[in-house]
């Protein structure tokens, strides 16, 4: 499974790289803090497969990188190969500002 660090992702976003973000956390978590992208809670992924492109990089993120790892494993089982996990999730992202 491909991984990306918070710093690497921040640099990609700042350089306007073609990347899609998917936040798989629950709505209440997203309301507290997010870095944008689509919001598809992990439990709803099966109903939203058609919204996930297969022709560009897609970075999945959650709070710590654990749920997004599991989500990527499930999506890879459904044929997706372009998925990247935000290592450490939002916790790692927030630590960039500290």
Feature roles, as predicted:
Residues 1-20, 24-59, 64-98:
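Rhodanese-like catalytic fold shared by cysteine-dependent sulfurtransferases
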